[in-house]
């Protein structure tokens, strides 16, 4: 059984993330979406909220499991017997960072490979940061995040839709 992890903060999950999740799920037998609980950052959504949102928007994907983790990704991968990490790339600038991370992971855990999926063109500009900034000012985020979570994003900024 080929297992992979698609890690991220997903704060909030975007349609770009969901695109990578769906495409990744079609490539492997079992995909773990790993939601990073980074204690050095102050996220908009708690790790529990992010996990729940991801579970909701991936419920139709029977081979996708959503779990949270903290610490090193390679340790999380080892705990779950995963040898493939999937990363999405939007632009060349993403590649430089992701290449360095994949090489670091390969040194730390030689049995782990990284697969890069380029984001679909219609989502190449999209990031969670853009979504948060748009929502903070009451901008329309319907084209950026799954329908199921739109109200929750606005609620974080005290905006009623």
From Swiss-Prot:
Which residues are involved in binding substrate?
A: 9, 41, 73, 87
Biological processes, Gene Ontology terms: coenzyme A biosynthetic process
Return the broad EC class: transferase
Any stretches that span the bilayer, and where are they? none
**Alphabetically ordered keywords of this record:** ATP-binding, Coenzyme A biosynthesis, Cytoplasm, Magnesium, Nucleotide-binding, Nucleotidyltransferase, Transferase
Q: What is its EC number?
A: 2.7.7.3
Keyword Thylakoid carried by entry? no
Q: Which GO cellular component does the record give, naming just one? A: cytoplasm
Q: Which residues bind ATP?
A: 9-10, 17, 88-90, 98, 123-129
Q: Where in the cell is it found?
A: Cytoplasm
The yes or no answer to whether the keyword Transferase is present is yes
Q: Which GO terms describe its molecular function?
A: ATP binding; pantetheine-phosphate adenylyltransferase activity
Note the Pfam families from the entry.
Answer: CTP_transf_like
Instruction: Name its pathway.
Output: Cofactor biosynthesis; coenzyme A biosynthesis; CoA from (R)-pantothenate: step 4/5
**UniProt xrefs under CDD domains:** PPAT
Instruction: List, alphabetically, the InterPro entries matched.
Output: Cyt_trans-like, PPAT, Rossmann-like_a/b/a_fold
The reaction(s) this protein catalyses: (R)-4'-phosphopantetheine + ATP + H(+) = 3'-dephospho-CoA + diphosphate
Record site: Transition state stabilizer = 17
Cofactor(s) recorded for this entry are:
Mg(2+)
Q: Tell me the function of this protein.
A: Reversibly transfers an adenylyl group from ATP to 4'-phosphopantetheine, yielding dephospho-CoA (dPCoA) and pyrophosphate.
Q: How does it assemble?
A: Homohexamer.
Recorded family membership = Belongs to the bacterial CoaD family.
Protein name (record)? Phosphopantetheine adenylyltransferase
Q: Provide the species name.
A: Lachnospira eligens (strain ATCC 27750 / DSM 3376 / VPI C15-48 / C15-B4) (Eubacterium eligens)
């Amino acid at each position: 059984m080929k297992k992979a992890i698609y890690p991220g903060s997903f704060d909030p999950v975007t349609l770009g993330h969901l695109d990578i999740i769906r495409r990744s799920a079609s490539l492997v037998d079992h995909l773990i979406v790993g939601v990073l609980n980074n204690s050095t950052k102050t996220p908009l959504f708690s790790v529990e909220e992010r996990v729940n949102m991801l579970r909701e928007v991936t419920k139709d994907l029977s081979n996708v499991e959503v779990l949270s983790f903290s610490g090193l990704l390679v340790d999380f991968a080892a705990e779950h017997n995963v040898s493939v990490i999937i990363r999405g790339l939007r632009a060349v600038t993403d590649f430089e960072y992701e290449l360095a991370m994949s090489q670091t992971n390969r040194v730390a855990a030689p049995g782990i490979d990284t697969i890069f999926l380029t984001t679909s063109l219609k989502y190449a500009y999209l990031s969670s940061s853009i979504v948060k900034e748009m929502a903070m000012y009451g901008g329309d985020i319907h084209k950026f995040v799954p329908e199921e979570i739109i109200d929750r994003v606005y609620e974080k900024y005290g905006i009623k839709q």
